[in-house]
Amino acid sequence: MDKNYLYAVANIRANELSLLSRADIDALIDAPDYKTALTLLDGKGYDTSFGSDYSAMLDGETEKTWSLIKSVAPSAEALDIFIVKNDFQNLKAVLKSEKTGDDAEKYLVSPSVIPKELLLKAVKERDFDSLPDFISDAAKKCLEVITKTENGQLCDIAADRACLEAMSGFAKSADNDICLLYTSDAADEL
C-alpha cells in the first residue's frame, strides 16, 4: 500500500478518537441544560465559543473535519464528488435569495468545492465564466429559469439535474467503482 494512503488512514484513525461515541451522544441527550451540553462538547474538543449559535459551531466542526480529510488525502480532488451537491445547493440558495431579497449567506452550506465568496460574487456580477466548468453553464441556465419563470422549483430541477451530471463527470474522471456507485446512489436520492 502506498505510504501516502497509510499516513492518511493513520491520521484519520487517530482523529476518530475525538468523534462523539454513542455514550457521548447519550450524555448530550441527557444533559439537563444547554450549558452542560456545551461543557460536554468542549471536553471532546469542539469550539464552544459560539455560545448559543450551535449551527455555527457545527459548521466550524464540519469545515475543520473536511480540511483534515483533504489535507491528508493523497488525491484530494477525488473527494470533490462527495461535496459537489453543496455547490449546487448554494447556487440555488443564492439565486433564490436574490429573487426574494433575502441574505443568501445564511443558507449556504459547507464544505463546498467553490469558495462561497466566489459563488456570491459570480452571481451578483453575472460572471458565471469565473466559476468552475462543472457549474458555470448550470448557473447560467438556472438564472435564466428563475428569471423567466420566477419558479424556484423549476430552478431546483435544473440545478439538481446539472448536479447529477457534474457528479457523473467527477465519477468518470476518478475512474473508481466506489465513486460510480456513489453517483448512482445520489441519483436515487435526488
Please describe what each predicted stretch is.
Residues 1-75, 86, 111-150, 154-176, ...:
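Conserved hydrophobic core element of enzyme catalytic domains
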Residues 103-105:
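Short helix/loop capping segments that flank catalytic or ligand/cofactor-binding pockets
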Residues 82-83, 95:
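Long, low-complexity, acidic Ser/Pro- and Gly-enriched intrinsically disordered regions
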Residues 88-101:
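Extracellular/lumenal glycan-associated surfaces
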Residues 84-85, 184:
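Low-complexity, polar/charged sequence tracts that form flexible coils or short amphipathic helices
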Residues 81, 107-109:
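Long, charged all-alpha helical bundle/coiled-coil segments in cytosolic proteins
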